[in-house]
């Protein structure tokens, strides 16, 4: 086993963990249009956005914060007029009602066109904005905040004006999971405090949803917490918190969420699942922080194999696998028991399809996190899916590779069919 410089992993986590408001797919469309509009220099008269099928699938039915509306059209309209000082995927932090009114006018007057087309990247957005004889464009590819191209009147410029440029981190694929976990073990409390801060942001979103949001699942689950035994309390609490935060986010409540690998729902699952287990067990702060790091690292590692947007439900598979790993760590389990719990989650949930972003994601998300916590407990009792059974391979790294292959080419046709179903509502 080779030694990993912990700074490599810390840079990866800091890069992949970011603040967002609302679903990241319409948020990224808003960001792309905003970048193009800044380059144009005047308010656009017309907006044309072309997205990959996965972005379309995730953006068509989801709430957009501050608007009371759903979908990519209003997100694109906002990108043309918004004056938010927030950056990246937090662009919709404080949407001005006057901006919403102007965006609605653009949409209602037929000035916003959204199309989807097959692209080489599962995550692709091209925004084109027009005013008089001039036009500008911006392209986002592979990562939700990765603006790879901006141009004015057909001429490309080197970098987007007024937009932060995201730097890429070193891939984690060159390291085994054991090497990654060993690196986490060398990290200090001070180096990992940002993970606790991230978890608290997502907890506040859940609390806001439970208090005043359209969160029927979260509220129903939370009301049933009384009477749960110690062993099941963590799973029940995680289920309620993740459901409420997800419903709040997907309905368009204006609550910030810390995302992992570009997904707010991944961040909700990873952070709140671990937080629920640690608080139920009264785990020390350092133990909690390292469990959060383990959960986040597993999520990022899986997404490197399956890409940011997958045909299977990434929250149910990637994030919940991370929660299972962090749970076993908090319970004092061995590395072998951690891998057993992860294998069980993947072996059970790998085929769960993604059918777009919307409030019902809360059912998948909360159920998967609760199951992951249960599998964490079961692995310590020698109950787990054995290596060589189905998608579960002889090593956890190979199982991650299998997930990537299941996504592409395995589920490509299913993903296209799902888009047809969603578009036909």
Swiss-Prot record:
Annotated GO molecular function terms are: L-cysteine desulfhydrase activity
BP term (GO), one: L-cysteine catabolic process to pyruvate
Which superkingdom does the taxonomy of this entry point to?
Answer: Archaea
Name of this chain's protein: UPF0597 protein UNCMA_16400
Organism, scientific name: Methanocella arvoryzae (strain DSM 22066 / NBRC 105507 / MRE50)
What family does this belong to? Belongs to the UPF0597 family.
